[in-house]
Amino acid sequence: MIGILTIQIHFPGCSSLKEKRSRLKPLIHRLQREFNVSVAEMDLHDTWQDAVIACALVNTDAGQIQRTLQSVVAWIEKHWPDVQVVDDQVEII
């Protein structure tokens, strides 16, 4: 089974694409390390204060996928206070 988590993120106070990328890149790398998920920026590439990232996870247990992907969202909200999670959606295929 494949789990896909799509997260819309808001970066308050960002005034350039360079600043947005400098804040987004460490977040992506940290998620990859902490949760062993594949992560990529998927949309809103040219918007200064917003981004959409997707996390993908493969596992045989749908419940484990769901728990892990929900943990990703909770972890972002706890450990990255300068980032606002606007929306998140989990899809299991």
Model-based region annotation:
Residues 2, 40-61, 92-93:
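Short, charge-patterned binding micro-sites
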Residues 3-13:
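Short glycine-/aliphatic-rich beta-strand segments at the starts of folded cytosolic domains
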Residues 11-15, 58-61:
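Structural beta->alpha junctions
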Residues 16, 30-32, 36-40:
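Amphipathic alpha-helical assembly/interaction segments
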Residues 20:
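C-terminal binding/interaction regions
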Residues 25-29, 36, 70:
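Solvent-exposed alpha-helix faces
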Residues 37-43, 84-88:
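A short linear hydrophobic-aromatic micro-motif
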Residues 57-93:
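C-terminal structural segments of small proteins and small subunits
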